[in-house]
Amino acid sequence: MNTDKLLVDIVDRYKRVLGDNLVGLYLHGSLAMGCFTPRADIDLIAVVRKPMDNDTKRALIDETFKIGPLPEKGLEMSIILEEHARDFIHPMPFELHYSPVHKERYEADRGYICGGTTDRDLAAHLMVVKRRGVVLYGKSIEEVFGEIPKEAFIDSIIYNIGDAKKGILKDPMNITLDLCRTLYYLKQGIVASKIEGGYWCTAYLPEEHHPVVADAVKAYIGSIKQMPVNIEKLSRFAEYMLTAISIEKHSLIGL
């Protein structure tokens, strides 16, 4: 997959639809952090100067459908206002959101728009943009994005793993690595990718949990097709990690 060509295509389409309203387009996630695989997704934040009307939102969704070929997990993007990027709000309001979860609804209902509300996940995404993001188009990250409070980031990453006990049995690789990078941040203050969190946990965690993390890492890098599901081991791992995360969170922010 030619990701450079794909990113150029994305930028061209966003510029064409949004015109002068587009402040910038920013890459976060695995592709920004140097650990992209074809099994991952492409993660984008777009920043606009003023609110978008529904016709413009729909036009951008239609252009998004034309982007490809995409990696296995597709493309996820959110659009926020410049004023909110600069003066951070949590949970963050957003103008428009697209991910494969919404694709079928967007295709079936041209009046459907995911936007005009708030998203607790965005604090985590914006922190990655701040610390490790890549400018695809527009103003620099330093010009556009204000500081993200540690408390908001922690709330966001813990919200993301809120259903980990059940989720790890359905999506063991991603939930395992999300738990790893969450604990990595709480212990070390490192805004890490999934795979970086996995590598750290293989050295940090008790030996009992090494096989679960090792399998997740192997699945992520593609050395095994998928992570095996051992309900007992995965459940014990999730319980251990959630307890460790809760302890570290309490020590950092007292909640």
Residues of each region from the PLM?
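Helical scaffold of the NTase/Pol beta-like nucleotidyltransferase catalytic core
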Residues: 1-26, 55-57, 61, 255
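Catalytic metal-binding acidic patch
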Residues: 25-29, 33-64, 74-82
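Structured mid-to-C-terminal alpha-helical surface segments
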Residues: 190-255
